[in-house]
Amino acid sequence: IDANILVRMNNGAKGVIRSSQIATGEENNLRVNVYGDKGYLKWQQENPNKLYFLKENEPIRVLKPGHDYNYPISLNSSKLPPGHPEGIFDAMGNIYLGAAKAIRGDNFYDHEFPTIHEGVRGMDFIEKVIDSHNRGNVWLELEK
């Protein structure tokens, strides 16, 4: 640990801030733990969609973004419905980046983005699911 900082809040609450720039085995494990005499809150940057909340003599609750039990400021910060990680936009952007490279004629990696073949295969899969259901849930082969 590179630093231990003792703090006292305006209301008299005491706390400790512990920090380390380098900790063996950790990547970027930014976390915030708030312990009180009647419960605690825990949050980790590597698992950002969960806030652990414990009140004395109650089971641990896991709070997630986008749900009505959150405060309005939290709901306003969530851009997607519950269950969708905020990073989904970055993931989609990576797919679009690969496609843009191909359109521009730049070098790109094989399988960097789905091609027409994967799109047609996905549509075939959906058609087979519906067809299987309509025929009494029989096994069907996908086109190669």
Please tell me what each predicted stretch does.
Residues 1-11, 33, 38-113, 117:
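C-terminal glycine/acidic-rich active-site capping loop/insertion
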Residues 4, 14-20:
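NAD(P)-dependent dehydrogenases' Rossmann-like dinucleotide-binding region
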Residues 13, 26-30:
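Glycine/proline-rich active-site loop of Rossmann-fold NAD(P)-dependent oxidoreductases
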Residues 18-27, 84-87:
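Glycine-rich phosphate/pyrophosphate-binding beta-alpha loops
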Residues 18-22, 35-37, 143:
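Glycine-rich Rossmann NAD(P)(H)-binding loop
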Residues 119-133:
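C-terminal hydrophobic helical "lid"/dimerization subdomain
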Residues 131-144:
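C-terminal capping/lid region of NAD(P)-dependent oxidoreductase domains
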